[in-house]
Amino acid sequence: MSSLTHFDAQGQAHMVDVAAKPATHRVAVATGRIEMQPATLALIESGTAKKGDVLGIARIAGIQAAKKTSDLIPLCHPLALTRVALAFALAEKGNAPQVVCTATVETVGPTGVEMEALTAVQVALLTIYDMCKAVDRGMRITDVHVLEKHGGKSGSYLADPQG
């Protein structure tokens, strides 16, 4: 495992200097899910939630979040993102009705977009919670992680499908 890059020789936090790194095509895919009551999933699926189109609003929130990641995470570089896409799948895993969110983020730049993909997923899922909390305060956001990343010196990463 390599050393932490966000600390200088004195142990002080700093933003990593990426000026000498080449701009390469970078892609990151992250996912997560929100578990809920069956009635809540039915509201989302039917489009009858009081606050409107839950997944449409969550998609826009996730896109906005990816673009604002460097404002939220102190040592992240501001990046010119070339693509942010969010997909939602409604499913039942065991006895847990859920919405699974997957975000794909791309750029051509000197640093990766994993944080942007993770932020997009988290904020999209938080938006679902916000829009449905009046009917289901027991929703649970879980399993947020990077599925894959490509580009840069460290190459590709694929999460273990077994978890």
Curated annotation (Swiss-Prot):
CDD domains per record = MoaC_PE
- Please state which protein family the record places this protein in: Belongs to the MoaC family.
As one GO molecular function, the record gives: cyclic pyranopterin monophosphate synthase activity
Lineage, top-rank taxon, reads Bacteria
HAMAP family per the UniProt record, alphabetical: MoaC_B
One Pfam match, given by its short name, reads MoaC
Subunit description: Homohexamer; trimer of dimers.
Q: What class of enzyme is it?
A: lyase
Q: Name it.
A: Cyclic pyranopterin monophosphate synthase
Catalytic activity as recorded in UniProt: (8S)-3',8-cyclo-7,8-dihydroguanosine 5'-triphosphate = cyclic pyranopterin phosphate + diphosphate
- Gene3D superfamilies per UniProt: Molybdopterin cofactor biosynthesis C (MoaC) domain
Which residues make up the binding site for substrate?
A: 75-77, 115-116
Give a short account of what the protein does.
Catalyzes the conversion of (8S)-3',8-cyclo-7,8-dihydroguanosine 5'-triphosphate to cyclic pyranopterin monophosphate (cPMP).
Alphabetical list of PANTHER family matching this protein: CYCLIC PYRANOPTERIN MONOPHOSPHATE SYNTHASE, MOLYBDOPTERIN COFACTOR SYNTHESIS PROTEIN A
Q: Where is the signal peptide?
A: none
Q: Which UniProt keywords apply?
A: Lyase, Molybdenum cofactor biosynthesis
Q: A biological process (GO) annotation for this entry?
A: Mo-molybdopterin cofactor biosynthetic process
Listed pathway(s) = Cofactor biosynthesis; molybdopterin biosynthesis
Q: What is its EC number?
A: 4.6.1.17
Residues annotated as the enzyme's active site:
130
